[in-house]
Amino acid sequence: LLGTAEADRYRSVAAAALAYGHLVIAQSPIDVNLAKQLNILLRETGVPEDRIVIDPYTGALGYGFEYSYSVMERIRLAALAGDGDLAMPMISAPTDTLTIREVREAVPEEQDAMAVAWEFYTAYSAFAAGASIVCVRHPLTVERLKKVLEA
């Protein structure tokens, strides 16, 4: 996956992806219409739709994630309703959760557990909203996600 292609710099990312056989992460700022528009622009530059992965950007849980969730859900529902411009897999990288104020200001011995909890719940919610790929940083988050997703 090569990324991120954004509205102001998608051509160079698309060219590199095409030249080297990579998929493109199309990142738009938490907006269904902007995600759709970027996918169209990428396809017009020659990137096949099966080589595009949508990243609608994910805020941390409690920091706008509710809106991110809503946008991800609407993208997935539009795709399921037949909108080919949004029928691509989604990626979510809620890694901001490790540095939010609640984690930074927690008692030192609780910071690690709190960081894992915030990252886990945000990542799990992203899966529920329709993300196919979720990027996390903490190894304990990976363990917990594997456990609940394999259940």
What residue spans do the PLM features occupy?
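Catalytic alpha/beta core domains of metabolic enzymes, predominantly
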Residues: A5-V148
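A glycine-rich helix N-cap at a beta->alpha junction
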Residues: L1-L2
